[in-house]
Design a protein with these regions (language model features):
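Patatin-like phospholipase
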Residues: 2, 43-81, 89-284
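General helical structural elements
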Residues: 12, 31-32, 61
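Sec-dependent N-terminal signal peptides
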Residues: 29-39
């Protein structure tokens, strides 16, 4: 029998990974986990994890995965959106929750948005996904500079994802990963959700995490993709398509802000995205 007591879960989830989770939220989570997994173990059915998007809050996924691991619970399938695609993809590759936690604590997050690199120091494969400049300004037909497509240029983000997923670079079918995996993104031109089940894991994850206005849309095979959370932030449907009988959905996206917390560009962008995500979750 599982023994997922409220206090036990709160003690085991690392504070540095948990960020702004409130104790009330964790109490609800612990109760749901007890009920869900008690039924699931008795039934012996296939289990899938659905990891939502949620920006910085998304790293709370790692804390939840760590507790589940310690209870001997492992998924048969994983699907992720945005930051959930990053965590889910790496977990599907075989990284443990502890390894993911250590990785996140060591990573220099500020460097991901400071695109100061020397192109001559990059491998050929890395150059393929890295723009030539650190600040990109496009010109229109009249040779007039246009505003950039995003606040940040994602050179270093692309390179970091390239490094993290390098060991899976030869795997073209995500069902062949240690844990079968799917992630989703949104087609910028049609607004339709797109599911990635094969190809480059790095590209699939990068497409899913293209937060509008913060990172430029990711171009792949003539299509431009933005954050998967815009079309479906909780990829439960993907897991049912993979064959999961039971699904644990881990939702970590931000709640809507009040007026006192919508004061700058980033906060307004975050609020705008979360309005769409909140509406999307209600529809699904």
């Amino acid at each position: 029998m599982l023994n997922l007591k409220t206090q036990q879960i709160q003690n085991q989830i690392p504070e540095k990974v948990l960020f702004n989770f409130q104790s009330a939220t964790m109490k609800k989570l612990s109760i749901l986990l007890m009920l869900f997994f008690f039924i699931n173990i008795l039934a012996g059915e296939k289990l899938g994890y659905a990891l939502s998007g949620g920006g910085a809050r998304g790293f709370a996924h790692i804390g939840v995965l760590k507790v589940l691991e310690e209870e001997g619970i492992h998924p048969d399938y994983i699907a992720g959106t945005s930051i959930g695609a990053v965590i889910g993809g790496l977990y599907a590759m075989g990284y443990s929750a502890t390894e993911l936690e250590e990785m996140c604590l060591k990573l220099k997050w500020n460097e991901l948005t400071r695109d100061t690199h020397q192109r001559k120091d990059l491998y050929i494969g890395q150059k393929r996904w890295t723009p030539y400049g650190n600040a990109v300004f496009e010109l229109n037909e009249s040779w007039v500079p246009q505003l950039p497509s995003s606040v940040f240029v994602s050179n270093n983000l692309n390179l970091e994802l390239f490094k993290l997923t390098a060991s899976a670079s030869q795997i073209q079918n995500f069902n062949e990963l240690p844990v079968p995996f799917m992630c989703n993104a949104t087609d910028l031109l049609t607004g339709e959700g797109v599911t990635f089940t094969e190809g480059s894991l790095m590209q699939a994850v990068r497409a899913s995490i293209s937060i509008p206005s913060l990172f430029e849309p990711f171009e792949l095979n003539g299509h431009y993709y933005i954050d998967g959370g815009v079309s479906q932030n909780m990829p439960i449907d993907l897991l049912h398509k993979m064959g999961a009988d039971k699904v644990l959905g881990i939702k970590v996206n931000s709640t809507l802000r009040d007026m006192e917390r919508v004061n700058n560009l980033v906060e307004i962008l975050d609020q705008t995205i979360n309005i769409g995500i909140t509406r999307n979750l209600k529809e699904h």
